[in-house]
């Protein structure tokens, strides 16, 4: 440890972590080198929001509990054999146990609390005592790839918004949103890709500057008038990062009778203590108050969220297509007395659920070689294997042209049950025959069709009322473990905060071996199949049709599925 005594063990400004590149291994095999590199990649300064504090994204979403735990995880992964499994409890390596070569090399449980105690107050006490860590979704599960990880999902959402509200034509229209953090930072690029202009309000100027540097936002403004002028004067879609507080800017538009075409928000409202700046407060004052009076920070932040949501509701009344983008801001406003906070829909039931019914979601992969050419070759392979999807091809072309890699080169690509296994096998074969310089890892966001229970986001408004049933992500994690994913994670509270979600993740390493091919066949079929199963069980016809076509064995539905074939 390099911290002085008395310092926060999660802070070390002397460290710069980057994943190794190339084919030389620090671990005993690629199956343990893969999680080692992806853990380090999560903390690359080009990837993480606050790497010196182990914070990857999403408020306080961390990769390890503290630096001592990080060092010990690295040490264990370097010595771990291919018949052993490391257990990680909220960012702390707690055990190594004998398993077998087809078992996961790492099993991770982050931020899980018994339901009665599953709230921010109890979590924060445990966090202060060094007993827990908030893993968000891909922070503590070591498969964050920077803002690209959410770009395509956001792009797909905005394209759906254009189709639903504007006959598919976003020309001359603009989006108002808040938040340019690790997730929200994807919005400006996704918006312009979909043909919209955007004003994204952000209170932390360094985040706007970072998005400018990495090509995710086009311009910076320091006043609403300046931002509006930039949009008005541009002949092409343009994104503007506006320095300010969303709780101030959104009501200003109401007062000035200016109605955006689309309104949403991706501030870190899920965490009122650490993720949302109260009205009238500076960043430094908020930092001081978090040390002095947490309850006051939370209360004041939630009051400010209520102001913002009230403005969003008014803009919706005036004709703006308004949607919640999964940060639980409606819930926070409801708790502050905005009784109609849920009058605008969440993005999943409004725009994404039909994709989930076919197991389509945020499939992603990263090149452990560190060579961008490996990603470009896999891009081409995706086009070869899925030749009849021009929308997907267009996405891949735009991604190559407009998205800068952060850390290890990676790609996000929304594909479903019928394609994930085929792509995984193709990538594994490319490693085997030397077409790729090193193995790739395939993972996904926890925001996927079968891996999350989140009543205010992914499972909002389920047809059968099963929004809060969290058996499904538990079954997903168990099945991915049985199938032999390289590492599997089970988290609580990602996206929407403590008490509001449970979710699971998996990553599988394509090392070119025959064993990997067998594991890929199981994992990359079963993982999206659980999403089809979950939605078919809830009564969705699209999911039932997909289950029938893919010959899933769903005991309670098999007689019905036979009639659909």
Swiss-Prot record:
Q: What is its EC number?
A: 4.2.1.49
Query: Looking at the keywords, is Cell division present?
Result: no
Mind telling me which InterPro entries this protein's record contains?
Urocanase, Urocanase-like, Urocanase_C, Urocanase_central_sf, Urocanase_CS, Urocanase_N, Urocanase_Rossmann-like, Urocanase_sf
One record GO biological process: L-histidine catabolic process to glutamate and formamide
How the cofactor is bound: the record states: Binds 1 NAD(+) per subunit.
Q: Which residues form a coiled coil?
A: none
At the top of the EC hierarchy, this enzyme's class is lyase
One Pfam family from the UniProt entry? Urocanase_N
Q: What is its main location?
A: cytoplasm
- Compartments it resides in: Cytoplasm
**Record keywords:** Cytoplasm, Histidine metabolism, Lyase, NAD
Q: Name one GO molecular function term.
A: urocanate hydratase activity
Descriptive protein name: Urocanate hydratase
Q: Which organism is it from?
A: Vibrio campbellii (strain ATCC BAA-1116)
